[in-house]
Regions:
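Short linear sequence motif anchored by a di-proline
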Residues: 1-212
């Protein structure tokens, strides 16, 4: 499960335009993203890709504490996303998006304590992660709440992702799509979406120590 990533940098604005035909938001965001932080996110607007800041950690409209809810909804298991109360509306409505980033971080416990590692694409290109999103106007504050959760899959046996998290925990991974699958994901029906939710090929990613 991924709770920390390095969002896309403005230096890759041209990559966003080439891949999605839209621009990065005219805003600032933190160098690292944690749950409830805003980060650049791709979703369809009037049928076309659009990039805006969205909160990492999905907030459904019925959430009581909308400020803290995202602390526990930043990842959604792909196997159960269609039935979990927090996620099923976004999945049913095919609110599919992409979290765009430079790299993401995971803890390796093989030394007996958590050591942070960075995972990125082997070709150093930005990463796009299949996600679901919600957007609504808070009736109490009038604020537009736009938020997302990254989908995860089992990663047991993956050459890189099997090394992260505690020894007895199931190995999970976010999904890193190939460029050819970006637009198909955004426009997918449920069957098509399911076919894209799989762990990245072993040679697609590399990892390195990234201590704080």
């Amino acid at each position: 499960m991924c709770s920390n990533f390095q969002p896309i940098k403005t230096e890759h604005a041209q990559w966003v335009e080439e891949q999605f035909g839209c621009s990065l938001p005219e805003a600032t965001w933190r160098a690292e993203t944690y749950p409830t932080y805003p980060a650049p996110f791709i979703s369809l607007q009037d049928g076309k890709p659009n990039c805006d800041l969205a909160q990492f950690g999905l907030v459904p409209h019925w959430a009581d504490d909308k400020k803290k809810f995202g602390l526990r909804t930043y990842n959604a298991r792909s196997e159960t996303v269609h039935e979990k109360p927090s996620y099923r509306h976004a999945w049913k409505e095919r609110q599919f998006g992409l979290a765009i980033m430079e790299s993401f971080y995971e803890p390796c416990w093989e030394t007996g304590k958590a050591v942070r590692w960075r995972i990125k694409r082997a070709d150093t290109q930005p990463i796009a992660v299949p996600s679901i999103w919600e957007r609504f106007i808070d009736k109490e504050t009038g604020e537009v709440i736009f938020s997302f959760s990254m989908l995860t899959v089992n990663a047991d046996g993956h050459s890189i992702m099997q090394h992260f998290h505690k020894p007895d925990d199931e190995k999970r991974s976010i999904i890193v799509l190939n460029e050819a699958d970006y637009l198909p994901w955004l426009h997918a029906n449920h069957e098509q979406a399911r076919s894209l939710l799989k762990v990245a090929p072993d040679n697609f990613l590399v990892s390195e120590l990234a201590p704080r």
